[in-house]
């Protein structure tokens, strides 16, 4: 069951974010994210004339290559569509993420590395869901490989992972 609709309403804005995780032939992982913003109506743009209904006015992509330790080995980004002519330049500092490790403090380090007046707010924001996608991709792949190696369908007890302790209700440590 979904959310109840509280009142009559009309959709005016769509933001689509898709993240995907890939294992590479070299054993590293590519984490890719895409953001697309569109409106449900035509609107004027100083730099693009009229932006048509359902046409993207933000469309960005990022790829981070990470190792098993979640260290960024390579980074690439592109702004395919932005509201201003300068927007594509905001992807230019994405390589500042190389060498950073996904983990506690990731958002702060990303903001320092690629945010602010030389970066792009939307690309910076995309790195948050990319981090959780990296965790899901790598953790799932490690478990899958362990099951294949032992020919077992038993899932490992993820509650044993200390890095997840108290990160959400499922991993809350109860007092005895």
Model-derived features with residue positions:
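N-terminal, Lys/Arg-enriched amphipathic/low-complexity engagement segments
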Residues: 1-3, 7-12, 16-17, 21-24
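A short hydrophobic beta-strand element
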Residues: 27-35
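Active-site- and interface-proximal helix/loop "cap" or "latch" segments in soluble metabolic
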Residues: 14, 21-23, 35-176
